[in-house]
Amino acid sequence: ITTKEIAKICGVSRTTVHRALNNTGRISEKTKRMILETAEKNGYRPDLLATGLAKGKTYYIGVVVMDVNNRYFSQMLSALEIEARERGYFINITLHQNDKEIEKEQLCKLADYHVDGIILSSVNKGEEYKKFIESLNIPVVTIDNKIADKIPFVTVNGRSAISKAVCEIAESGYEKVIFVCPPLAEKNLENIYVHEERTAGFKEAVKKIHGLEYVIIGNWDYQKQAKKELEKSEKKTAFLCTGDMFALNLIRMFEKNGKRAGQDYGIMGYDNIDFLEYVTPRLTTIDNHVEKVAEEAFNLLLQLMENKNVAETERILETVTVQGETI
C-alpha cells in the first residue's frame, strides 16, 4: 500500500499521512492514530531510500572487498555488519574478486545508489586511483591495502608483527626461517600493500639476527618449494606464513609426508582466523584484530560522514602473537 492509498482510505491529504508516519507537524491524536492503524493493518512499508534521499542521508554503507571465501574477509564483514546495525546503518556488500575494473565499477554503482560512505579493501593503488576515489564525492575509508597518502586508512602494523615473529622464532631455537608470502607474485599486478609491509618487516628482522638463515618464497607454487627447502635443510627450520591458510596448507602437505608441525619443523601463521581452535596441533599465529580494524574503520567513516574535523585519518593498530603448539 502507498501513502496515496492510505490518504484515500482515511479521507485525509498525503501531507497529513506523511506527518503521521514521520511524527512531524501538527495533527490531532485521533487522526494520527487512524492513519497509523490503517498503515499497519495494510502492511505499509516506507520507501527508505526515497526518504533517505529526501533527507540527504540513506543510512546505507557500501563495503567492497575481495571475496567471502577468504576467512579474514568473512570475519571482517561480520564485524562491520554488527558495527553498522548497532548504529542504525545497513551495509551493502559487493566483491571485486581482485579485478581492478570490477572494483571501479562497483564503487561507481554504490555512488549511484547514494550510499552515505564506503569501506574498501582495494586491489588498486596510486595517485590516479586516488583522484578517482576523490571524484566519487563520498567518504571512503580503506582497510589493509593503502591506496595513497591522504586517503583514510585503517590497518594493523604488519611490518612490526612479522619482525617480532622472526625474533620469537629465533629465540625458540630455530636456525633457519622460511618466509612464505605467495601474493608477492602479484606485486606488479595489483595492490598487495599488506604483504609488502610484512615482507619488509621480515627482511629488517633477519638482518639483525646474526647467523639466522632465511629463504623467501613468493610464488603460488609455495607448497612444492617449501617441501624442497625442508628436505634439504640441515638446520632446525621454521616457516613464517603471511596467512593462516598458507600455513594450514603446508601442515596438511607435510603430514602426508610423515612430518609433524612443532616436531619436525616449526610454523607460524598470520590472521588468527576463527576456526583455528578446531585445528590440531594448534597453530601459533599473529592476531591482526579483525574486529578492532572493523570498529576503527567504521568509527572513522562515521566521523567523516558527519563532517567532523578528523585530525588523524590513518589508524595503525598493533598485533599480538597467539601461542600455539607449532613453534
Task: List PLM regions with ranges.
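N-terminal helix-turn-helix DNA-binding module of bacterial transcription factors
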Residues: I1-Y59, Y72
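Structural motif
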Residues: V64, I119, A238-L240
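Short beta->alpha connector loops
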Residues: Y44, Q97-K100, S121-G126, W220-D221, ...
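Active-site-adjacent beta->alpha loops and helix N-cap segments on the catalytic face
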Residues: K125-E134
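Amphipathic helical "hinge" segments at domain boundaries
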Residues: N42-G117, E196, K203
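Short hydrophobic/charged patches on amphipathic alpha-helices used for structural packing
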Residues: A50, K104-L107, K130, V166, ...
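Short beta-strand segments enriched in small/hydrophobic residues
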Residues: T16-R19, L53-N69, K176-N188
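Bacterial carbohydrate/catabolite-sensing allosteric modules
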Residues: K41, I82-R87, S135-T142, K146-I327
